[in-house]
Amino acid sequence: GWKDWLKTAGGWLKKKGPSILKAVVGAATQ
C-alpha cells in the first residue's frame, strides 16, 4: 500500500537527503 511506499521513501530520504542537499547547495553556490 501507499503507507509502505511512504515508509520506504521516508527512510530513503533520511539516508540520501543530506548528501542530496549538499550537492544541490554546492551546485547553486558555484
Swiss-Prot record:
It comes from the Eukaryota. GO terms for cellular component: extracellular region. It is found in: Secreted. InterPro entries: Poneritoxin. Keywords: Antibiotic, Antimicrobial, Secreted. One of its GO terms (biological process) is defense response to bacterium. Its main location: secreted. It holds the Pfam family Ponericin. Expressed by the venom gland. Belongs to the ponericin-G family. Has activity against some Gram-positive bacteria and S.cerevisiae. Has a non-hemolytic activity. This is U1-poneritoxin-Ni3d. It comes from Neoponera inversa.
